[in-house]
Amino acid sequence: MGRRKVEIKRIENKSSRQVTFSKRRKGLIEKARQLSILCESSIAVVAVSGSGKLYDSASGDNMSKIIDRYEIHHADELKALDLAEKIRNYLPHKELLEIVQSKLEESNVDNVSVDSLISMEEQLETALSVIRAKKTELMMEDMKSLQEREKLLIEENQILASQVGKKTFLVIEGDRGMSRENGSGNKVPETLSLLK
């Protein structure tokens, strides 16, 4: 007799749901461990219970190494997607420039109508405004990041200045303490005359 098929749907009873989560989580982690051993691979499992408790397990490598590799790979994918989007955005501009170039070649100058030239001019102005808007956006982002960096540097400078001020104050107070008489009535000896 085989196992009966369980319908996959939300378990209404809270305690049954928690027990099922615990058992299946343990089974998932065990399967991940077995896969790691069998295939000599690094596997990370992260599960969050309905109550918000985090469970994680790593096989093959430690969790931080696996997550670092994932982040590097994910960043590369995002760069590739960003590059593909930029290419898609620039293709119409490239095609437009090719059309303008072909229309303005000497052999085609006689065949270009005024309406066609006006249309090309409007398309070029539209493309130029899009490019200028993107340029402005990028410049604003750069300016914002530079302002944030400036703010951080000013805060760091203030912290360092206050630390230097405290050290200077301690040195000055220390010098004053050295020049005063100590409790027994004897003066603290001054530095050697050779060192002055």
UniProtKB/Swiss-Prot annotation:
InterPro entries: MADS-box/MEF2_TF, TF_Kbox, TF_MADSbox, TF_MADSbox_sf
UniProtKB keywords: DNA-binding, Nucleus, Transcription, Transcription regulation
Domain of life: Eukaryota
KW Transcription (keyword) present: yes
Domain K-box intervals: 80-170
GO biological process: negative regulation of flower development; regulation of photoperiodism, flowering; vernalization response
Gene3D superfamilies the record matches: Transcription factor, MADS-box (3.40.1810.10)
Main location: nucleus
Functional note: Probable transcription factor involved in the negative regulation of flowering time, probably through the photoperiodic and vernalization pathways; more efficient in cv. Landsberg erecta than in cv. Columbia background. Prevents premature flowering. Involved in the modulation of vernalization impact on flowering according to genotype acclimation to altitude.
Protein name in UniProt: Agamous-like MADS-box protein AGL70
